[in-house]
Every structure is written in structure tokens, then in C-alpha cells.
Amino acid sequence: MAIGEFGGAPAVPGDNRVLVSTPLYWLYEMSHAALNPSRAWADATRLLFRNPGNPWSYTTLGKSVAAACELFERSTRRYTRPEWRISSTLVGGERIPVRASTVWQRPFCNLVYFERLFEHPPKRLQPKLLIVAPMSGHYPTLLRGTVEAFLPNHDVYITDWIDARMVPVSEGPFDLDDYIDYLISILHKLGGETHVIAVCQPSVPVLAAVSLMEAEQDPCVPISMVLMGGPIDTRINPTAVNALAEQRGLDWFRTHVISKVPFPNPGFMRDVYPGFLQLNGFVSMNLERHIEAHKQLFLNLVRGDGDSAQKHKEFYDEYLAVMDLAAEFYLQTVDTVFVRHALPMGQMTHRGRHVDPSAIERVALFTIEGEHDDISGVGQTEAAHRLCVNIPSDRQAHWLQPDVGHYGVFNGSRFRAEIAPRISDFVLSMTLSDRAARRPRNGAKNGAKNVRVSGNGAALRSA
């Protein structure tokens, strides 16, 4: 979970329980509403200076005015939840239509299934894949490229987390324990022959959920879990994000970044970590890069470089769309993962039950890290192997991807070319191994054969 570098609201002397950031959210909503007329004026001016019937639209001055108005409108608008925009995929050289539908619902999460509408069933085995998206500020559509990479060879499901400001207070709170309950419920919905991919923040709750299910000999445990860039043990190579959590402490986050949802949102008066504060943290981590990107957008609009401008818009339409997090979930995650390091210390509990990764015996484990990850340092995800001591060595693998940062672990060209094929190979190998060994789903130990997992011809290092 990216905590960001938000400096917090000004401290209020006295009662530390006061949510001192609450006025910021209400002022943010008021300022957004106050800017509506200015946004409308800027958009009208942009259209005027883009109109082919206006002679000024062909001049550098006219193009500059239109570009400046567009930048103002984009900088002050509220970015809504993006669409999935996945209508088809290529399977065996054939273009197959894809239909996204919700197959499971709870107040804070929907499970989306990307159904491929085959005319004839594929001959190749299509393992079932559950992608657990991070609940860390951005919408799950940020993983659009991740979904697209796996659709040709897998039956893909993804957790679609709900913006907390859209959930009425009457639905009750949502914390890390609820998150784990949701994951277990989803795995029960999908059945035992499922593979789970946890992208960043969900690595801890996914590992916890599988640990609890194994301890109960649950027949619906997944065949494998893939943990990608997750903060399993943030004591290893701590990043600036990790250091911030330890330095500030839980009370600071409770009093400085938690706010109440203002009227007229459906979640009015719910305690949340607001999306706009999270975005402040995201942007501040690479401020110069974002300023330069918007400068280039202005120049591209003036030059008429539509392709470059469109790529910028598509990226920032996704990047600037953020969601609020339930305060209970955020604070419990900060405390459990970043402050107390409860999972690697053997102190994590779920509704009073001890979370013990050593209970995992049947579920294969694949961890993936990025060489230049500045959010989850190298070694933090690999630490899962030292916790899951009872998984057979031939059912474990680790991959350190060179030359990628945090987002490159689950998106981008290197992910598509080097990481996704390795995951697909691992998933397919574990599926075949599981079926060949006729692994009982009632918890009996299996006799899985040694399977060499590779991707693009490159062998994976055994953990």
C-alpha cells in the first residue's frame, strides 16, 4: 500500500482524537464546486479556439489559448471511475469477444468476470485466475493491461473495489479482517481449481487468507498464489514509504489523514482516507516528472501532435482517478503491515485467530519483485518463502525482474514480454502437476512431481 508523502493537516493542540483533516475534505468539495463556472468558461473558450470556422484557430496564439484552457480544465476536473474498455482478446490467432460482468457482490467489492465468448471451446487448458487488485487509492482499472495480458490463456476474474465515499454508513465499517473475509468468500465462490495473483498491497491479506484456509483444511484453497511487489516484510530494504509509516506512527495517520465524507456523497459522514490526499502523495513522489509531462502536453497540443497528446490523456485519466479508502481498513493495514510487521513477526491475527503461514502445504508460491521498486523494496515479497516453510521446494519460485520499478512489475512492455509469460507457465505447470498427482482437496499431503517452470525459455530461480 502506497502511503505517499502527504505532510498532513496542521496539528491541533489537545485532543489527538480530533480528525484534523476533516475540514480539508469539506473545503476540497467546496472549492471543486466553486470552480465549476470557471471550468465551463475554459471549456467553451477551448472549443471556440479549436473551431475550424475561427481564423484564430490556425494561429500559434489561438492554439496556445486552446491548449491552456484544456490544461486548466483537466487540472481542476473530478476524474470519474474509468471503464474497463476490454471488448476482445486474441486466442490462438482468433479474435474472441469479451464480456465483463459482475458475478459476486458485497458493499465494498464486486467480483468481475471477463467472459470470453467462444464459438468453440479452446483445446488448450485455460486455468482459472483471480487477480486481487490493490485497495490503495487507484481504481482496479489501473490493472487493465494486467487483465489483457492474461486473457488469451486464462479464465480471468478480478476484485473491483468500491470507492468508500459511495458506500452508506449504514453498511457498516470495513477493515483488514473484512478484506480477508471477502477473499475467502470469493475463493469459495470460484472453487478449488483457482490461482490467485496478488498485486502489491493484497499480498499480505492473500497470504493471510490462504494460511487461514489451510489451517482449516478448506477444500477451496487455490492451487497457487502469485505475490507481486507486496510488502510481506517491510523491515527488509525499507523504502521511503515504509520509513514514513514507522516514523509517524498510527496515531499521526489517524489524526492527520482520516476525514469524514462530506455531503452530498452517499457515504456522508463515513471515516475515510480521501482519494485526493492519496493523489497528493502519489504526485509528490515524482513531482518534477508530472510537471514535465503536463508541459509536454501543452506543447503537443500547440504543435498538433494528437497521438502524443492522446497517450498523455489516457494515462492521466487513469492515474488521476482515485477512490477513498475506509479508515478502518487503512489504519489496520498501516498498523499491521508497516508499523508492527505483524505477519513476519508471527503476531498477525484475524478475528482472534493466529495467522500462521507455515500451515500452507498444498498451495504453490511464486513471488515477483522489481529491481527498482521504490514502494516495496527488493526482498520484501521474497520473504514469503521464509514464512511458508512447509510448501515443497519444487512448488516455490521467485523472480526478480531487472530494470523495472513498482508499476513495471504488473504493467508495461516488460511485464507483457517477461513477467506475464512466467506467471502463465507457473500456473499451467502447477495445474498439470496438481491434476497428475490427483491432489486431494481435503488437506491430505500430495505427491506432486518436480516441475521445472520457465518463461520465454528462461528458468526461474528456485526459492
What residue spans do the PLM features occupy?
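Conserved alpha/beta-hydrolase "acid-adjacent" motif
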Residues: 374-380
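Conserved acidic catalytic loop of the alpha/beta-hydrolase fold
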Residues: 166-168, 178-195, 207-211
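Gly/Ala-rich beta-loop-alpha elbow adjacent to hydrolase catalytic centers
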Residues: 198-206
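Short, surface-exposed "cap/lid" segments of acyl-processing enzymes
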Residues: 83-167
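Catalytic histidine-centered segment of alpha/beta-hydrolase-like enzymes
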Residues: 401-417
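Short beta-strand/loop motif that positions the catalytic acidic residue
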Residues: 360-361, 367-369, 373
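Active-site nucleophile elbow and catalytic-triad environment of alpha/beta-hydrolase enzymes
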Residues: 338-357
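Alpha/beta-hydrolase-fold enzymes
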Residues: 2-60, 64, 191-192, 209-328
